Amino acid sequence: VILLMSTQALIQSGVEKRSNKIKALSKRKTTAESWWEGECYGWWTSCSSPEQCCSLNCENIYCRAW
């Protein structure tokens, strides 16, 4: 009985962790959503760091497509 309960608890823990990972990933926005909401710059916009660009590519002070 104890082994069965331990196994069930272990399985339940794994299911909960997987569920939390799925929820976290589903909350991530697409590049288009981030751009539309003004969270990052589109191509050919002036930038000072890669994190500002939706493409994460800031080259020669401009966001590049890739």
UniProtKB/Swiss-Prot annotation:
Propeptide positions: 10-38
Listed InterPro entries: Conotoxin
Endpoints of the signal sequence: 1-9
Disulfide-bonded cysteines: C40-C54, C47-C58, C53-C63
UniProt keywords, alphabetically: Disulfide bond, Knottin, Neurotoxin, Secreted, Signal, Toxin
Keyword Signal set for record: yes
Subcellular location: Secreted
Tissue specificity note: Expressed by the venom duct.
A GO term for molecular function: ion channel inhibitor activity
GO CC, alphabetical: extracellular region
UniProt key word Secreted: yes
Family: Belongs to the conotoxin O2 superfamily.
Domain remark text: The presence of a 'disulfide through disulfide knot' structurally defines this protein as a knottin. The cysteine framework is VI/VII (C-C-CC-C-C).
Record protein name field: Conotoxin TsMEKL-03
Origin species: Conus tessulatus
